[in-house]
Amino acid sequence: MLSLEGVTKTYRVGAFGTSTLTAVDDVSLDLAPGEVVSLIGESGSGKTTLGKMVLGLLPPTRGRITLDGERARPGKAYYRHVQGVFQDPFSCYNPVFKADRVLTMIRGEYFPGVADSEWQGRIETSLKDVGLDPGQILGRYPHQLSGGQLQRLLIARALLLDLRYLVADEITSMLDASTRIDVLNLLADLKARGLGVLFVTHDLSLGNYISERAVVLYRGQVVESGSTSAVFGNPLHPYTTRLLSSVPRLTARWGGGEDDGPGEVPGPDGHEGSSTLVEAEPGHLVRRAVTGTTSLRSAS
C-alpha cells in the first residue's frame, strides 16, 4: 500500500521569505495495488506538487508518505517500485541518447549482474507489453518518435523495474485523441496486472473513464473523495459541481443557453473558518465547515 498521511507542502514567498504559501494542505489518501485513483483539480490546485512529493522530487513540509508501512525515502529501493510519467515526454529524455541506451541504463543502475542476452530479452518484452515494436523503436532518437511512442517508452522503462505504483501526471494532455485512448487502455491493462496508478489530471472525462476512485483538490485541500461513480454521479461539494458543469455533454450545444452551474466558489469548504472531511455517504467524503479543528483524512 502506498499511503499519504497529513501531507503538507508550504513555500516561503516574498522578497525576504516572510510569507508562506501552502500548495498542499493536510492531504491523506491510500493507493492499493491494482487500483487507479484520479487526482483531479484545476491548475494551481496542488495536484502536481502532490505527485512530485510521492516521487520524492519534493520533500513534504509535514506529514508522511509510506510504502507498505515504511517511510518512503528517495533512492534505489523506493524507485524500484514507484515511478512517474509526466506531461511532456520529451523533457524526460536526453536528446543524444537512443532508445536502446535509455533502457540499458536501467540495467547498469539496478541489475548490473544481468547478462546482455537476458537484458535484451527483457527490453523486447517490456516494449511489446506497452504495444511497441522493438524493431521500430530501438536505435531511434527521441525526436524520431511520436509523443505517444515516447510516453509508452517511459512506461516500458518503468516496467523493467519491479514496478508496483505509477504516478501518471497529465500524461495524455499533449496527445491526440486516438493516441490518448491507447495510452489510457494501456494503463487499464497494467492495472489488471496489479499496478497501482495515481492518475493526475484536470480532465474530468479522463478521470471518469479510467479510475475507481476520485480525489478532488481545491487550493491544496481535498474537498471531495470517494468512488468515481459517487463523486461524478452525486457531487456534494460546490467546487466539484462547478467542475462537472464545465464538462461538455453530448446533449448540450455551445451557446445553447443551458445552465452554467454554480458561480464562484468562495473557499475549499464554501465557508469561513476551519473545515474537515465528513462521510456524507459510505466511502463518500466531502469537506464541510466545522467549529473546531479536525485533521483531514481521505477515504481508504
In which residue ranges do the predicted regions lie?
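A short, surface-exposed alpha-helical micro-motif characterized by mixed small hydrophobic
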Residues: 207-209
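Helix-to-loop junction immediately C-terminal to a conserved catalytic motif
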Residues: 55
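Charged, flexible cofactor/metal-binding loops and thiol motifs
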Residues: 227-299
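ABC ATPase NBD coupling module
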Residues: 15-18, 70-83, 97, 101, ...
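Conserved ABC ATPase signature
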Residues: 141-145, 149
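A short, proline-enriched helix->beta-strand linker immediately N-terminal to the Walker B motif
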Residues: 160-164
